[in-house]
């Protein structure tokens, strides 16, 4: 049976993550309060941030920026989008 959490991002109970997705206290908090669905939303947002800002996940400044954005995405007022960012149009299957 799946572990259920009261997801802070979605605002309802949903399937929880299998393990903490990030080290430290932030990872533990995400594990306790964020659903798999919301985590997938973060991964898409993080990919957009990395691409638009040309971040390197191995650069300490980039990692600090992404960590702050992750915390804001789940527990704050929401993560930022790059100025002028327009999401790609949905593709027809």
UniProtKB/Swiss-Prot annotation:
Which UniProt keywords are given for this protein, alphabetically ordered? Iron
Q: Which Gene3D superfamilies match?
A: Fe(II) trafficking protein YggX
Please indicate if the UniProt record lists Iron as a keyword: yes
Q: Does the keyword Cell membrane apply?
A: no
Q: Which SUPFAM superfamilies match?
A: YggX-like
Q: Which Pfam families has this protein been placed in?
A: Iron_traffic
Recall the GO molecular function terms of this protein's record: iron ion binding
Per the record, its GO cellular-component terms are:
cytosol
A biological process term (GO) from this entry = cellular response to oxidative stress
Q: What is the documented function of this protein? A: Could be a mediator in iron transactions between iron acquisition and iron-requiring processes, such as synthesis and/or repair of Fe-S clusters in biosynthetic enzymes.
Q: Which family does it belong to?
A: Belongs to the Fe(2+)-trafficking protein family.
Q: Which PANTHER family match?
A: FE(2+)-TRAFFICKING PROTEIN-RELATED
Q: Which NCBIfam families match?
A: PRK05408.1 (NF003817)
Stated name of the protein: Probable Fe(2+)-trafficking protein
